[in-house]
A protein has these predicted regions:
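N-terminal prepro-regions of secreted/extracellular proteins
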Residues: 1-40
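Mature secreted bioactive peptide module from preproproteins
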Residues: 24-108
Length: 108
């Protein structure tokens, strides 16, 4: 019984680790001096930064599902959702002047 439980626990841990490793992501902190940027990133295209009074993150992967998201200094989070290859995932929140603004991309 103990061996069966140990094997089941080990298998569950391996599956959880594998699913976490299937995700690929990146992030950047956006400050008042950070410019709005866009360019190639991890097999796709990432547009991010401060746009007017908003913090944005838009990501599309060319061959896999992609997602853009952002969080401001008030912990307001916006998730563009998982989108199929070649489709933009767009997120936007209000930019906070006191910092804590961060943008993310992810693909799987």
């Amino acid at each position: 019984m103990i061996i069966a439980t140990l094997l089941l626990t080990t298998a569950s841990t391996a599956l959880a680790t594998a699913s976490l490793n299937d995700r690929h992501s990146g992030s950047e902190v956006v400050s008042e001096t950070t410019r709005y940027e866009d360019g190639p990133m991890a097999g796709g295209w990432w547009t991010r930064g401060k746009s007017g009074s908003n913090l944005i993150s838009e990501y599309k992967h060319y061959t896999k599902e992609g997602r853009g998201s952002c969080r401001n200094g008030n912990a307001t989070f916006s998730d563009g959702g998982w989108k199929p290859a070649e489709t933009w995932s767009k997120s936007k929140v209000g930019y906070t002047l006191l910092g804590g603004n961060k943008v993310y991309y992810d693909y799987k």
